[in-house]
Amino acid sequence: MNTPTPTQRTWYRTTIFNVSVVAVCAFIAPGLWAAMNGLGGAGSADPYYVNAANAVIFCLQVVVCVFGSSLIAKIGLKWAFALGMVGFPIYASSVYCNVKYNNSWYIMLACVIDGICSGIFWLTEGAIVLAYPEKHRRGKYLAYWLASRIMGQMIGGAVTLGVNAGNQEEGHISVQTYLVFISIQAIGPFVAATLSPPEKVQRSDQSKVKINLPAGLKAELHAMWKLLGRTEILLLLPMMFQSVFSEAFFSTYNATYFTVRSRALSSLVASTCVIISNFLLGFFLDWRRLSVNTRAMAAFIIIYAFELSLYVYAMVVNKEYERQEPRPLFDWTDDGFGRAVCVYILMLVGFNLMYDYLYWLIGTVNRDGGDIIRLSAVVRGVESAGQAISYGINSVDSFLLSSAVAVNLSFFAACIVPSAFVIYRVGVVNGVKVHHIQQDETLQTSGEGSHDIMDANGKSDD
């Protein structure tokens, strides 16, 4: 077999192929998981019990994200990623049993299994999408990855809509819908097994993927503590926590105010809007006519202004619905459906824009590519803590959705100032706003507090 030349790469070792593997897995696993939960409580008639079960998943993910890197060191990134895919079809089957047989114990057992497996998945997936791409293409690859996850939600919504189009009542979706999800998710581990190990990935710019695996648990915990001591990471912790906090709210909102077929339709339309908006953001974040700092600041201002106005809008709408007796239930043929569904669609768009931006920002401020697994562990661990609390709150049926909006808004406001301190200094080296950050090098601290470096012209070589 001929050894590839610098201009000739083996197709299954390329960045695009390996990011595509992650994208397909994102479609199969969290994408279809989000498709079920986007219907409200995984499509069940009682979203509150499923929300409580989901809170268990995210609590376990926090623990796994702290200790999971040691497992990755033992079995490798590739096989840890494949192992992480195992829990998703088990979770889907438990919801199926809950809906069809009113079986409660299995869903809790499945949540324990899925919490451990998905914790490994979140940890490895985050490390791969941050470490594998060339930095000047990271925005596009992040958009591609997130679009694939949303594509899972969109196709899941289309399947659900097709199966449940005649259901104008509230309640759970058709049990046949879950069988489709289970069948697709079952192939996930086999797809994940086609991933290339980081040392074998062949980037277009010939740079190497740099990931440091921990030597032992004690050393890893020490390195994690050291990472958490970095100022920029500490300041971004509130943003990591808040970025996913709204998921439980808009999922419960969809289950509360819409018929089964309207829930499926809103999930389908929202997913389409998210894919378009994420790609627009990804191309903007990679637009090198503007400096890194200008892109970071502009995206931050636009996304946060959009999110703030959206929370106010959601509060007004939910307060209005909570005053009505009986509680409104919208079908797509009803007056007021458009206004009600806009809250769900816009919340999903804002959620994913924030998520895309967070990962681009984390990749940009990352000081050393070798720290990417523990950095992913921090991000995913804090995210899971936020989701555990959020789903726990929304599992209480007496907790008003307007109160959930208020809690979301409080966390949103709390993360603005610390995040702004980091974003203000992103891409600034010795007082100069650079257009490119070099890939996977130990970065030097500038007088402005940044950890970015640039080449002689402040731009990159493609």
Swiss-Prot record:
It is a multi-pass membrane protein. Keywords: Glycoprotein, Membrane, Transmembrane, Transmembrane helix. One of its GO terms (cellular component) is membrane. It is found in: Membrane. Notoamides have been shown to exhibit antitumoral activities. Notoamides A-C show moderate cytotoxicity against HeLa and L1210 cells with IC(50) values in the range of 22-52 mg/ml, but the IC(50) value of notoamide D is greater than 100 mg/ml. Moreover, notoamide C induces G2/M-cell cycle arrest at a concentration of 6.3 mg/ml. Part of the gene cluster that mediates the biosynthesis of notoamide, a fungal indole alkaloid that belongs to a family of natural products containing a characteristic bicyclo[2.2.2]diazaoctane core. The first step of notoamide biosynthesis involves coupling of L-proline and L-tryptophan by the bimodular NRPS notE', to produce cyclo-L-tryptophan-L-proline called brevianamide F. This is Notoamide biosynthesis cluster protein O'. It comes from Aspergillus versicolor. The lineage of its organism: Eukaryota, Fungi, Dikarya, Ascomycota, Pezizomycotina.
